[in-house]
Design a protein with these regions (language model features):
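C-terminal catalytic/substrate-binding lobe primarily of soluble NAD(P)-dependent oxidoreductases
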Residues: 1-192
Length: 192
């Protein structure tokens, strides 16, 4: 993340806030997690004052996950259990995954981007996507897979003119990208 124009690290699950989406989603908790904006803090160092990425989950998630982390159950350093080395995180995931994974589970993806300029004016975009019942495709598969497919399509069609190694924000024409996702039912809407 960027704070005062400088890359900064903060603890995961910190700076909890509420973000509200239209029904049926409603209020979600937003909190810091790692990796979401990848190299952007270094690319925009000194150019952007503040840049944050927060994960969204249903209310109560942080209250459950903080003690799990504080107890060391997410640590990756092996510990000895009955003479065998065990990675706490691996054990935790193996133990809870079967209880959290439901065959009838239907996911959703909720995303919001808020931008504010030096002049105080801003813009915001929102994406809400749901499990595709007809095709049996999760919202996460739709939003990630279609995004990659659309980017590849735009490259093949010559709509991405930039060559070489670039980040998507540098290379992919935003309006075309949003329109192509919309054709596939993944709608990014500008909020007013």
């Amino acid at each position: 993340m960027l704070r005062d124009g400088r890359p900064t690290r903060v603890d995961a699950l910190s700076e909890l806030e509420q973000v509200t989406f239209p029904p049926p989603v409603g209020a979600l908790e937003a909190f810091h997690t790692g990796g979401g904006i990848s190299i952007l803090p270094w690319a925009y160092e000194g150019k952007v004052r503040t840049m944050e990425y927060k994960t969204l989950r249903y209310p109560g998630h942080v209250a459950v996950m903080r003690p799990i982390r504080e107890l060391g159950l997410l640590d990756v350093t092996p510990v000895k259990v009955k003479g065998k080395e065990v990675v706490p995180r691996d054990l935790f995931i193996a133990a809870v995954s079967p209880k959290l994974t439901k065959p009838e589970g239907r996911d959703l993806v909720a995303l919001r981007v808020d931008v504010r300029g030096h002049n105080g004016q801003g813009a915001a975009w929102q994406l809400l996507d749901y499990y595709d019942e007809a095709r049996g495709i999760s919202a996460m598969m739709r939003t990630t897979g279609y995004s990659l497919a659309v980017t590849g399509l735009m490259q093949v069609e010559g709509r991405i003119a930039v060559q070489g190694v670039r980040t998507p924000d540098e290379a992919v024409p935003f309006a075309d990208y949003v329109a192509e996702l919309g054709k596939r039912g993944v709608e990014i809407r500008e909020l007013t």
